């Protein structure tokens, strides 16, 4: 098992100290949130994080097709990978707080697919078709080797990730029931594209807090199910005939209003108060090990 840690681009000095600590502790990935309204610029933090460490891989978890044009994303990640070979990954999703805070909906599956299909050639020193135009990064002479990770909660995006991504990030909780359900859809997508599902790299996004105090540890992880519930609600709204597992349905039924501005990814936010320890345990690793 390989471990990664997620970081918010804020409190710069604390961030640098934290990524160094993560590297020393053996973490292999440092994933940064891309949400330009709520936090500082992720590109700046990725760059300084890489400059301040020696081994750990840095990437977005996740960027999106709506606030970052494909050429901008490709140029940045190709540049960064040229400076730090083998230590850069590009995480992409449909967009959550980065777009909802501007009153916009997340990207549709078709938009996400087109974005990734455009990024592949751009990141490989090849020509991409963008809005009918042939576009390439003129300065890029060879493939810098930037793996693409795609996140997913619902079947469509999970299947898309299985078809296109180098790594899939599951955002469905940590129960065997939910993970197996998600992997079934990832596998379907992989096979539809002629890929072997067994060769895909898979990550699970969850909160983790190790402590002898189970209740206290769970309370520290409230942010994870509270945020995931927004994606589950979208899935239920866009696909009423969904087949999501019962653990996700339970969270959906308990879900209350969510305020991105006052406490996104914050376990102390008022909108996490409804979460019981049982619900949290479905979406986090909390307590003694």
Feature names for model-found ranges:
Residues 1-13, 63-70, 142-153, 208-211, ...:
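Active-site mouth loops of central-metabolism enzymes
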Residues 1-60, 146:
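N-terminal beta1-alpha1-beta2 module of alpha/beta enzyme domains
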Residues 3-7, 30-32, 57-61, 88-92, ...:
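Hydrophobic faces of well-ordered beta-strands that scaffold small-molecule active sites
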Residues 11-22, 73-76, 152-160, 289:
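Short, acidic/polar
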Residues 19-24, 46-57, 77-88, 162-163, ...:
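Acidic (Asp/Glu)-rich catalytic clusters
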Residues 26, 49, 80, 119, ...:
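Conserved, mostly hydrophobic/aromatic
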Residues 38-47, 174-190:
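Active-site-adjacent beta->alpha loops and helix N-cap segments on the catalytic face
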Residues 105-139, 179, 184-289:
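An alpha-helical appendage that flanks or caps ligand/catalytic pockets
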